[in-house]
């Protein structure tokens, strides 16, 4: 062991402890950065739905289904209503949450007994529900909740970085220990 190289066990344990602590904090920073990336991506996906003032998770009432999703391209209300009436699904309530040239984001409420007709329209026009899990919060509130989580991770990372910088005081000790190990090994 370290003793046979003229290096004390206590010294070896101290150096090992410092190195392990630094590596552990570095791994935590990496994991937090990955989580921050995922949170930011979720926030971006939610942004088009900011105009929705009900939780995205609401999918039905006693008598109606509620759907949130998007269509490719820019759709106006007239075009949407025409697409639904062509399939005999006139009794739908549609809210255009946001519309851009490339996407139209919708919230649709319709009677449960019209589900087959509405699903046919969805297939025909390419209606796509969000790929993320729907929240029991409104999109605005969910973005705020995610932001709070992201800020906590950023703050945690700042703490780790400060702790790692404080470990600089052990750098000479670690280098000296490592050099002595190498020298002993080369004997």
Predicted feature descriptions by range:
Residues 1-187:
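Long, charged N-terminal accessory/stalk domains
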């Amino acid at each position: 062991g370290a003793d046979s190289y003229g290096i004390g066990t206590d010294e070896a344990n101290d150096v090992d402890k410092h190195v392990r602590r630094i590596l552990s904090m570095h791994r935590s920073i990496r994991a937090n950065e990955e989580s921050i990336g995922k949170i930011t991506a979720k926030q971006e996906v939610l942004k088009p739905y900011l105009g929705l003032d009900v939780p995205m998770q609401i999918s039905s009432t006693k008598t109606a289904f509620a759907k949130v999703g998007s269509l490719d391209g820019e759709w106006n209300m007239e075009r949407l209503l025409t697409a639904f009436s062509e399939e005999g699904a006139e009794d739908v309530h549609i809210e255009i949450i946001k519309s851009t040239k490339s996407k139209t984001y919708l919230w649709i409420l319709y009677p449960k007994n019209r589900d087959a007709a509405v699903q046919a329209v969805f297939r025909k026009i390419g209606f796509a529900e969000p790929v993320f899990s729907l929240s029991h919060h409104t999109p605005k509130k969910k973005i705020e909740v995610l932001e709070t989580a992201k800020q906590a991770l950023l703050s945690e990372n700042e703490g780790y970085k400060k702790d790692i910088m404080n470990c600089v005081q052990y750098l000479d000790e670690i280098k000296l220990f490592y050099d002595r190990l190498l020298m002993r090994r080369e004997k």
